[in-house]
C-alpha cells in the first residue's frame, strides 16, 4: 500500500496560531460567488494589524492522475495590498482558538492523510474552511457553524452564506465540530 501524508508546515501553523486572541474583521474571497459554492480557491482574512491568505494548493495523489488532484490549504501572511476583493463578509469577532482537522482516506492500495478543514473558533460560532472532496478541482467551502441549532447557528443577523435548505447534505465537518 502506498501511504502519503500531507500537512501544513510549522510556519503555516504558527501563522494560524497568531490569530488566537485577535479580532478577525473580514473574510474575503477572490471568487465572485459570494461564498455560495465550494470554488473558493483563495480566501483572505483581515485582522486588526495583519492579514492571512489561505489558498488551495494542488497536491496530486500518487495513485491518481493529474486530472484527479486534491488541494491542501496553503497559509501565508500577506500585506493588505495583496487582497483581491470580490466577496466580503464582516466577522468582527475575537478568535478564541484555531483547529486544523485532518482526515485519512483510502482508495484501493493508496492511503492519504491530509488537512480537511481549518476552524476559527469564536464565542458564539465557528468559521469553517472545508475541502469537501479531497480529490477534486473544487476549492474550499466557507460557512459558519454552531452547535446551538440545526441550521448551524446561522441567523439573519449574522448574514452569512451557508444555506442548509439548499443543500440536503450537511457539511462533513459539522458533526466533528459539534463533538469538540
PLM segments and residue spans:
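Surface-exposed, interaction-prone regions used to assemble/regulate multi-protein complexes
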Residues: 1-180
Amino acid at each position: 500500500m502506498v501511504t502519503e501524508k500531507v500537512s501544513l508546515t510549522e510556519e503555516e501553523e504558527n501563522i494560524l496560531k497568531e490569530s488566537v486572541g485577535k479580532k478577525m474583521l473580514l473574510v474575503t474571497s477572490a471568487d465572485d460567488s459570494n461564498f455560495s459554492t465550494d470554488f473558493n480557491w483563495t480566501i483572505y482574512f483581515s485582522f486588526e494589524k495583519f492579514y492571512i491568505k489561505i489558498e488551495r494548493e494542488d497536491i496530486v495523489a500518487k495513485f491518481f492522475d493529474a486530472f484527479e488532484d486534491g488541494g491542501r490549504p496553503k497559509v501565508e501572511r500577506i500585506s493588505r495590498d495583496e487582497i483581491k476583493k470580490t466577496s466580503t463578509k464582516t466577522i468582527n469577532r475575537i478568535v478564541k482558538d484555531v483547529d486544523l482537522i485532518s482526515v485519512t482516506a483510502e482508495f484501493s492500495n493508496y492511503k492519504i492523510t491530509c488537512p480537511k478543514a481549518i476552524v476559527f473558533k469564536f464565542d458564539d460560532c465557528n468559521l469553517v474552511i472545508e475541502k469537501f472532496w479531497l480529490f477534486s478541482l473544487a476549492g474550499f467551502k466557507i460557512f459558519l457553524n454552531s452547535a446551538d441549532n440545526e441550521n448551524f447557528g446561522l441567523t439573519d443577523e449574522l448574514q452569512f452564506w451557508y444555506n442548509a435548505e439548499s443543500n440536503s447534505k450537511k457539511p462533513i465537518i459539522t458533526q466533528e465540530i459539534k463533538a469538540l
